[in-house]
């Protein structure tokens, strides 16, 4: 039976409905807001596995082209593999929901939110989070939700809840916040140098909306909720648990504080291996082996957290506010247009910049419409960066981390009008032990400055952590390691300039974080960011004055809009001829902006610009032009003064003395100066060779 609930947000009703579409799924929700609609389904496999130490959850958000009344471009008219945007929204849904599933459920879970309608005014991602949570909440799958999300934009001192695409585009800050009615569990977004206070206020406003949306889902569960399926807890206990604990705990308390990540891993694995061999017969049982591994993880968890809270002792011996040693180096590669290595402790990123033309822009074709991007950032995380063997390729993690770094740097990248190039930054993570995405922000800044990209200001990033015990006891950690990220209660990445925040991402593993902790974490993050910026500025503080000799050069000009056709020529004939002759690439915009790019050192930008100017300019009486003799006649010579524009230089205008034959003075193909004397009633150009010579000799 169809059941629905509604909630007014702004000018439109948010509708959540179940019992009509996709009824064979464990749970399904049709969510609608304005002209956008999401169908979210959740299914669980039939067989439960005992003793799983993770949640086997897959989130596959997808957008259908028909949602926007479009047919996919290209030869194949079917939706293909997930686009980056779909992967990012899948992560947006996964991150706040995954901690609320119980590992003891033991079944594979697949969540499929599908965008089946969009008005191209309201972003569908927030609707997808709400629909996904509601689908799980009303289903028979155990879930400690519900979860909801809200987007907040900030512009001119005002906060806008769930803004439209156009409002987001002009906002000074845009964040997506997710959480439960108890607290915030996830934040991500970008900004144009906003203060920490602006962000805190935005979080508060978002959580008020989240609480209302969670209540809405609870109302729907009362109407249509299913009885939850039972959990499959591991009933067995680890044999010889106390003996294993007594032998391992003191040894781990030492090995976990060795100086490097590799040493800590090797020595901890050695302790584990020795005890596994000692109790080998017992650990032949699969359940006993899982309990054995779980005990080691629990010991590491307790050792690290207790020492931080009781002694302020971190894995590598730092204090809670200390930043690992940082080194920066620019110009590390000979041929690329810009390069830099940023190293922070055992995390290292090689940033490489390539300067391209407008023809290198990233083109997006999705349900939001076609658009182009002239700033591209790609993040690569090869397995060797953590000393492991694995496949190379781009996964969801790479796309997510690259997006965070892109958001953080984008506000400081110059506008196309000031820097008419395409900029591609590639971050090669060469070592990783905590916050490689923030190292990418730093190496990206350094490599762009080295490449001569006129960034508005340098950007740096830092990852913060949180260890809590109860409501009042906590420690905020600056520049966290991988171990602290894994065992902590919060991972909070903040990037920005000396004057404000540009990018941030937060994931919280506990029920929520108080405003006081958030305020202190942001303040401590600012201290760390300023420290990192200071070191980066010692390496390079301003963009290089010149682009690399291997980078393309550009000339820009504006022509009358009614001359665009004349420049292009029939079938692009004129543009192609100029491009081939001067070894350049020419781009013409509808507003008359013409951009001429050099291809290499043999390009003649000035020559190409002169020809473009000539084609698109009207001849002026009294001007002297450098022309080419096209044809010799008995009565004079036809001279081309501008591309496609010829005039007659009469034999009487070749010299002050009598000329018997034109060929005595001029030859076809000869380049000569001529002065435009007049344009007659028929539009014909009358030229003078002798007047031009006299004028230039003055």
UniProtKB/Swiss-Prot annotation:
Residues given in the record as Mg(2+) binding sites: 485, 491
Record keywords: Cytoplasm, Magnesium, Metal-binding, Nucleotidyltransferase, RNA-binding, Transferase
KH domain residues: 552-612
Catalytic activity: RNA(n+1) + phosphate = RNA(n) + a ribonucleoside 5'-diphosphate
GO biological process, alphabetically ordered: mRNA catabolic process; RNA processing
Assigned EC number: 2.7.7.8
UniProt entry tagged with the keyword Transferase: yes
Main location: cytoplasm
Cofactor: Mg(2+)
Transmembrane segments: none
Subcellular location: Cytoplasm
Domain of life: Bacteria
GO molecular function (one): 3'-5'-RNA exonuclease activity
GO cellular component: cytosol
HAMAP family with a match to the protein in the record: PNPase
Matches recorded under NCBIfam families: polynuc_phos (TIGR03591), PRK11824.1 (NF008805)
Function: Involved in mRNA degradation. Catalyzes the phosphorolysis of single-stranded polyribonucleotides processively in the 3'- to 5'-direction.
Homology family: Belongs to the polyribonucleotide nucleotidyltransferase family.
Stated name of the protein: Polyribonucleotide nucleotidyltransferase
Organism: Treponema denticola (strain ATCC 35405 / DSM 14222 / CIP 103919 / JCM 8153 / KCTC 15104)
Gene: pnp
